[in-house]
């Protein structure tokens, strides 16, 4: 079981984030990641710091040497897929081939609307996500891309240089479209704040989707993000679903349940 730290670049100064990243890099963690929001979540105040995801991940890549660095997840609707493909490759080269790029459809309506993106219905957001995934995957293979699609118009775009060790992750808890997209595109599948039972169900759905398209399910890595309330006086009924609570043995037992359903990595979030 691989252990990581998933620290959103919010409610902290950059110096505090850098200290956390340094701990992850020097203490044997496998993974350190950021996320991609304009506002902190939950939105307690618009004045609280919340750093932009691509820039934050670039800093994370540049100042670490050992951990894989990631974002869970970049919102596909915030950036043209050509730009996100180029950003991912740049971060991958900054890190020496340690970068993982997660992509999702977005969900936080307030930040969409207040930053001028609108907020399309869920089905439309997933359609845009799928088209973006198609283009990013193709751009990372070096051939010129011609695409006159529903959402994006690329005319001979080429992504150079090529990735060194860049991996594509799909993040989410949906039961239908998300597993299908993971089977089709992903090197890894991440689920935030889920129970072992739900994680196991979603992994089975990814496996069935792989079987339908003839893909080897074992190629796909997996992880969950878990809240951290160990030895806390926070009442269990208000702790987030998918959290480590109680003492050391309770946490070990919970991690074991995720391992038993096939999860390969735990990110403390």
Residues covered by each model-derived region:
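Active-site-adjacent structural elements that line small-molecule/cofactor binding pockets in enzymes
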Residues: 1-269
């Amino acid at each position: 079981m691989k252990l990581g730290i998933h620290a959103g670049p919010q409610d902290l100064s950059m110096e505090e984030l850098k200290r956390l990243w340094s701990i992850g890099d020097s203490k044997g963690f496998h993974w350190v990641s950021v996320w991609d929001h304009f506002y902190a979540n939950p939105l307690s105040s618009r004045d609280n710091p919340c750093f932009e995801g691509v820039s934050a991940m670039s800093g994370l890549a540049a100042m670490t040497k050992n951990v894989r660095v990631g974002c869970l997840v970049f919102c596909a609707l915030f950036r043209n897929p050509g730009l996100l493909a180029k950003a991912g490759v740049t971060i991958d080269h900054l890190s020496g081939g340690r970068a993982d790029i997660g992509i999702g459809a977005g969900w936080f309506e307030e930040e969409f609307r207040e930053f001028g993106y609108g907020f399309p219905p869920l089905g439309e957001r997933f359609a845009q996500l799928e088209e973006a995934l198609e283009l990013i995957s193709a751009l990372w293979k070096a051939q010129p891309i011609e695409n006159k699609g529903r959402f994006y118009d690329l005319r001979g775009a080429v992504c150079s240089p090529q990735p060194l060790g860049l991996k594509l992750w799909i993040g989410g808890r949906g039961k239908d479209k998300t597993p299908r997209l993971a089977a089709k595109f992903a090197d890894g599948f991440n689920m935030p704040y889920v129970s072992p039972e739900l994680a196991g169900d979603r992994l089975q759905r990814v496996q069935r989707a792989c079987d339908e398209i003839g893909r080897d399910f074992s190629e796909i890595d997996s992880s969950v993000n878990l809240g951290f309330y160990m030895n806390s006086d926070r009442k269990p009924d208000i702790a987030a679903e998918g959290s480590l609570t109680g003492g050391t043995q309770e946490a070990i037992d919970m991690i074991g349940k995720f391992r038993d359903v096939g999860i390969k990595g735990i990110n403390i979030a």
